[in-house]
Amino acid sequence: MVNIRPEEISSIIRKQIEQYNQEVRVINIGTVLQVGDGIARIYGLDKVMSGELLEFEDGTIGIALNLESDNVGAVLMGEGLSIQEGSSVKATGKIAQIPVSDGYLGRVVNALARPIDGKGDIPASEFRLIESAAPGIISRRSVYEPMQTGLIAIDAMIPIGRGQRELIIGDRQTGKTAVATDTILNQKGNNVICVYVAIGQKASSVAQVLNTFEERGAMDYTIIVSEPANSPATLQYLAPYTGAALAEFFMYKGRHTLVIYDDLSKQAQAYRQMSLLLRRPPGREAYPGDVFYLHSRLLERAAKLNSQLGEGSMTALPIVETQAGDVSAYIPTNVISITDGQIFLSADLFNSGIRPAINVGISVSRVGSAAQIKAMKQVAGKLKLELAQFAELEAFSQFASDLDKATQNQLARGQRLRELLKQSQSSPLAVEDQVATIYTGVNGYLDILSVGQVRRFLVQLREYIASNKSEFTEIVKSTKTFTDKAEKILKEALQEYTELFLAQEELEKTKS
């Protein structure tokens, strides 16, 4: 047996005493009184804060929303089927936050930023609060750069700028999602990070959008945040804030971002469900009193940052669904008053074959021509006026039997201009192609064609310019201006191609 000297023992004990650290941890614990419908009532937790995350015995996470005198009302972020009455709940001392990194690009995640596309974990070293404060007045600058959507009707008449919030509003099945997804497709090569937030959508619809993005190579710069219709209301309520937090991560790094919220009506319904189950007093249309704040604090996070903060931007395109075209309902009026303009999609236009079904008369952009390149301003000025006059004349001409020649000509021009605005889904146009198309219409080059020939003529004209008059495209692209030289080249192309097109049509007629 080894002899141990007493002083060795005492020195070991002394070292251990020195290393001993009496750490006191206070854990705030409560007891579940009642649970069901995604809501838990908890007794205790007297030090809990509003919005704090709670952890239940089975690992489910909840958010404390109602702090009452004798209990706490919490919403569950999950099914919570194994939570029982009497089980304990612990306050975590944290509020909802998500991991963020460049690794999220090309991935599909849920409202807690966890991947749901089966491609493994996403590495992230940084965290952002799901609900963070919007940039202040001093942190912003006015919107001045265009955010091209690739849709002629929008880019020419309802222009959107980087940092703007533009509402897309219309009945179901009028092409709202198509306008938003086309805008994402058009950002290819523009160094814009896109976030598509699907709230309460059918999983099949989200899969279709994902498929389109993958086919067109748009997932390289896009993140999809999805909480389908079968998700708990809490997660549907959180999804838009998660999308905004992911976009903010890139915005504060000086990047340009675009966020689509599809759609905020579903988020408001999820929030209404949570509020009614928490027994908060209902207001108009049974929505809680703070439903305006729900959307305003989300949309105010979209901004164009000043040069000290890196000139990044977040452009928001919220979507709201109306019932039978009623724009004066509660949620539509709220979101219209928060945003910088709205694009109104009409079911009547959609059904009559005008797609995208944008009602140019009541759609508006409050940023206006500040968000257009000079070339677009030069050619698009006449377009909105001529279309407005045409709409007025068309309504009037239904009652008049004999119209004078000038009126007939104006109606004919209007019909061709309306045809010019039609575009197929998932085929956004570059801005130089849009300039050529609008110039062709407003300067009467389509007047000699029948309405049925217009779209075919324009598609082939754009191909002709690309292959034979590429100098025009280069001038508009590099100078962002419709110069005299560009106009001269375009006029030549129009004269040459119109003759060619009419000769081809004549040849086909004689063949048939």
UniProtKB/Swiss-Prot annotation:
A Pfam family assignment: ATP-synt_ab_N
Membrane topology per record: Peripheral membrane protein
InterPro entries named among the record's database cross-references: ATP_synth_asu-like_sf (IPR023366), ATP_synth_asu_C (IPR000793), ATP_synth_asu_C_sf (IPR038376), ATP_synth_F1_a_nt-bd_dom (IPR033732), ATP_synth_F1_asu (IPR005294), ATPase_a/bsu_AS (IPR020003), ATPase_F1/V1/A1_a/bsu_N (IPR004100), ATPase_F1/V1/A1_a/bsu_N_sf (IPR036121)
Any one GO MF annotation of this record: ADP binding
Predominant localisation class: plastid
Top EC class of this enzyme: translocase
Gene Ontology terms: cellular component: chloroplast thylakoid membrane; proton-transporting ATP synthase complex
Binding site residues for ATP: 170-177
Entry's localization field: Plastid, Chloroplast thylakoid membrane
Superkingdom, natural source: Eukaryota
UniProt-listed Enzyme Commission number(s): 7.1.2.2
Sites marked Required for activity: 363
Keyword terms, alphabetized: ATP synthesis, ATP-binding, CF(1), Chloroplast, Hydrogen ion transport, Ion transport, Membrane, Nucleotide-binding, Plastid, Thylakoid, Translocase, Transport
Reaction equation(s) it catalyzes: ATP + H2O + 4 H(+)(in) = ADP + phosphate + 5 H(+)(out)
Subunit note: F-type ATPases have 2 components, CF(1) - the catalytic core - and CF(0) - the membrane proton channel. CF(1) has five subunits: alpha(3), beta(3), gamma(1), delta(1), epsilon(1). CF(0) has four main subunits: a, b, b' and c.
Annotated family: Belongs to the ATPase alpha/beta chains family.
HAMAP family in UniProt: ATP_synth_alpha_bact
Record function comment: Produces ATP from ADP in the presence of a proton gradient across the membrane. The alpha chain is a regulatory subunit.
Name listed for the protein in its UniProt record: ATP synthase subunit alpha, chloroplastic
Native species: Chaetosphaeridium globosum
